[in-house]
């Protein structure tokens, strides 16, 4: 039996608590100029970092049959609750709600759909890598998918909300690379250096929380507007 990573379990627990506390604030109309900025800026990026890292460290797709089975399991795990909650929440007008959520994912449990789309792209890239036996094939497929999402966002496409996907795709991508190449990262960035980098990033983040309205920052473009 594979040993669980207790550090990742702790991070997931922290992220879950942040999501709960953030939603308590929103639904009870509790306004705070800094606290919600901090929560919103940490909770979902943390989830996608963890998801990407686990995908990078986990067992890879090796054949088409395995690809089909894993996609099926992920569809049940992610899409079933996504659409079930939509039906429960909008029971009297499901068709209208369905049309809305497919073009505005944050109308529903958007995280599940976003994670499913990233997972499908990841498994597809892994399948091509297994066929060619070259890692470059994985990154070719992955970066092509990233470009499709970026172009869709820039073109104003709203189906499956590229505007949301483009925010969290970098977190998933970087974490996947780190998870897949842990030895490489540890060689060129030892633990002491990682702690210094993490501390510096934390300081920069806290300064951004104080100086900027991170709730409205939906990408590098908006960050540039606020700092101009």
Task: Name these PLM-found stretches.
Residues 1-147:
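Membrane-cytosol interface segments of multi-pass membrane proteins
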Residues 1-7, 183-195:
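Short, Lys/Arg-enriched, disordered terminal segments
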Residues 26-28, 59-62, 182-185, 211-214:
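Transmembrane helix-loop junctions in multi-pass membrane proteins
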Residues 30-35, 97-105, 151-163, 212-219:
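Membrane-interface helix caps and helix-loop-helix hairpins in membrane proteins
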Residues 44-58, 111-126, 157-188, 224-228:
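Specific transmembrane alpha-helix
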Residues 64-72, 181-190:
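Hydrophobic, small-residue-rich membrane helices and short re-entrant helix-turn-helix hairpins
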Residues 118, 122, 143-153, 170, ...:
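Hydrophobic, membrane-inserted alpha-helices
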Residues 187-228:
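Alpha-helical transmembrane segments and terminal signal-anchor/GPI-anchor hydrophobic tails
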């Amino acid at each position: 039996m594979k040993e669980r990573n207790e550090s990742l379990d702790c991070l997931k627990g922290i992220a879950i608590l942040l999501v709960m506390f953030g939603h308590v604030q929103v639904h009870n109309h509790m306004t705070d100029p800094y606290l919600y900025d901090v929560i919103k800026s940490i909770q979902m990026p943390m989830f996608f970092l963890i998801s990407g890292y686990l995908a990078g460290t986990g067992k890879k797709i090796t054949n088409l049959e395995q690809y089909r089975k894993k996609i099926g399991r992920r569809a049940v795990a992610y899409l079933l609750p996504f659409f079930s909650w939509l039906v429960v929440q909008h029971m009297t007008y499901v068709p209208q709600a369905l049309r809305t959520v497919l073009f505005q994912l944050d109308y529903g449990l958007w995280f599940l759909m976003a994670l499913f789309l990233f997972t499908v792209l990841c498994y597809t890239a892994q399948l091509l890598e297994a066929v060619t036996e070259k890692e470059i094939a994985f990154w070719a497929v992955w970066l092509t998918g990233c470009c499709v999402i970026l172009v869709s966002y820039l073109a104003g496409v709203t189906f499956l909300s590229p505007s949301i996907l483009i925010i969290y795709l970098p977190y998933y991508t970087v974490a996947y690379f780190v998870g897949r190449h842990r030895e490489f990262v540890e060689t060129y960035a030892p633990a002491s250096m990682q702690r210094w980098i993490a501390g510096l990033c934390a300081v920069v983040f806290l300064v951004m929380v104080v100086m900027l309205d991170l709730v409205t920052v939906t990408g590098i473009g908006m960050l540039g507007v606020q700092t101009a």
